[in-house]
Amino acid sequence: MAEITASLVKELRERTGAGMMDCKKALTEANGDIELAIENMRKSGAIKAAKKAGNVAADGVIKTKIDGNYGIILEVNCQTDFVAKDAGFQAFADKVLDAAVAGKITDVDVLKAQFEEERVALVAKIGENINIRRVASLEGDVLGSYQHGARIGVLVAAKGADEELVKQLAMHVAASKPEFVKPEDVSAEVVEKEYQVQLDIAMQSGKPKEIAEKMVEGRMKKFTGEVSLTGQPFVMEPSKSVGQLLKEHNADVTGFIRFEVGEGIEKVETDFAAEVAAMSKQS
């Protein structure tokens, strides 16, 4: 077995753009023959995947699955809406979802490692960067899910509710985007930040500090209601709050998770005309 030196790994990285561990693995399998390692990496799609790795993957799908009292929600990203609808991409996302449910896997790095070879092969086939971005689980007495297309997914856990009510609550979460279950769940940090914002606004209106503080107290009660599930008007019957709806059914929500494709990812806007002009200058 030939010695796999650091300089050899470095050279392969520079020539292929692949990661250090992938380069070391390829060189080991090729017994130190760098040309053979490159050839094998080309065949496996590893080089193409490495070149696509820097591309921003902000599109994709949200998948949900419930197995009894256990549910998983998953986001898998690609670069375009076109690929998000591709049968091969959808099948890959479904396979990752099934594995997460079966193994109760909530560590995204574990999923990434488990499906890396399949991901690389799919990148080579499709021609876009693909990323298993995040996964989360929810447990409860009664679970419900809702998906708005493939772009928004919600899991809701409740006690004392039937499946229809939980489904309606999941639809509400998808539409209204609450951040907490109840007003009292809003963290002190979030409350303090909003309090300072509202106090600054009130003070800028020229009100004395004592009056401004009383005004803000009223606004803060409204704020904690707006960002919490039970404090929001129920989307299907806005005359009552979700909290009132739950009270009528003698039910309680114990948790929810809402994923939306690409949230928090900065998507690069491409100027097609400028891109074509740049390419023509290079040719």
Curated annotation (Swiss-Prot):
Q: Which domain of life is it from?
A: Bacteria
GO cellular component entries: cytoplasm
Q: Does the keyword Protein biosynthesis apply?
A: yes
Q: Please state the protein's primary subcellular location.
A: cytoplasm
Q: Annotated region Involved in Mg(2+) ion dislocation from EF-Tu: where?
A: 80-83
Official protein name in the record: Elongation factor Ts
Family stated for the protein in its record: Belongs to the EF-Ts family.
Location in or out of the cell: Cytoplasm
Q: Which NCBIfam families match?
A: tsf
Q: Which gene encodes it?
A: tsf
Functional summary from the UniProt entry: Associates with the EF-Tu.GDP complex and induces the exchange of GDP to GTP. It remains bound to the aminoacyl-tRNA.EF-Tu.GTP complex up to the GTP hydrolysis stage on the ribosome.
Q: What keywords is this UniProt entry annotated with?
A: Cytoplasm, Elongation factor, Protein biosynthesis
- Which SUPFAM superfamilies did the record assign? Elongation factor Ts (EF-Ts), dimerisation domain, UBA-like
Q: Name one GO molecular function term.
A: translation elongation factor activity
* PANTHER family attached to this UniProt entry: ELONGATION FACTOR TS (PTHR11741), ELONGATION FACTOR TS, MITOCHONDRIAL (PTHR11741:SF0)
